[in-house]
Amino acid sequence: MKPSLQVEFCGHIYENPLMNASGVCCMTTNELDDMARSSSGAFITKSATSMERDGNPEPRYVSVPLGSINSMGLPNKGIDYYLDYVLDRQDRFPSENPPFMSVAGMSIDENIKLLHRIQDSNFRGITELNLSCPNVPGKPQVAYDFELTDQILSSVFEFFTKPLGVKLPPYFDFAHFDAMACILNKYPIAYVNCINSVGNGLYIDVEKESVVIKPKDGFGGIGGEYIKPTALANVRAFYNRLNGRIRIIGTGGIKTGQDAFEHLLCGATMLQIGTELQNEGTEIFERINAELLQILEQKGYQSIEDFRGKLRSIS
């Protein structure tokens, strides 16, 4: 019998675990429709702010040999644009899973207002709160401030009752894994997304003796193959620390079916693809699904749950 890539996530059944990372192929309704027609299991909107944002000056995204560097600055069409889209799609395709919604306020108050808009709407899908954008000048990554993160989540769950996940930055210290997991376990969070890009990297054009992006003197978030070991470590660390009801989306360095398998083996249930989706287009989902299925067949697994989270240690 052929293996299945079907996964259950936050009360929804998806035909496979793949989706776009917020920021790629999700800015406009045309791009979101392209995602809907693709072989991905799900898709997510661009991280929305209260009003439309142009983002940082260009050049702000550059593909580099093992990934990408970006300092986009949260360009988006605003919450009303994306909420209108998901509600319209929800009405037109009632038997389908709604898209994920992503929000990223520029302040605590803005995050609360954005989530109130979603809570007060008829949206039946899953929302992702981005607490980890490293590319807005003058704005720190919220999720590196543990006390502030705790305060935000406490305020959010006073009113928000729909499924809510949190997108996290990468952590590099066991004490930080412990501290953040302790906070997350206090709240009815549906999932965590590990990880956003690794913030404030630098890539240099040696011929020009110059940085390659304009914002922040060339400092930007690193994505792609560079960050896969860090992403896997974060997925695994949180899988081992979070209570069983909190699921994990693995994001970072997924280019092949083997990369996807590794994220799932570490404990992820869904997978987001950013850099390689930007490079290859939506055809990447069909390819990675096929490669992942082939791995399951070779290993004799019938489903993702046969191996998810079962990474072995060396005794």
Swiss-Prot record:
One of its GO terms (molecular function) is dihydroorotate dehydrogenase (fumarate) activity. Its EC number is 1.3.98.1. It comes from the Eukaryota. Its cofactor is FMN. It holds the Pfam family DHO_dh. One of its GO terms (cellular component) is cytoplasm. One of its GO terms (biological process) is 'de novo' UMP biosynthetic process. The keyword Endoplasmic reticulum does not apply. Binds 1 FMN per subunit. It catalyses: (S)-dihydroorotate + fumarate = orotate + succinate. K.lactis has two isoforms of DHODase, a cytoplasmic isoform and a mitochondrial isoform. Homodimer. This is Dihydroorotate dehydrogenase (fumarate).
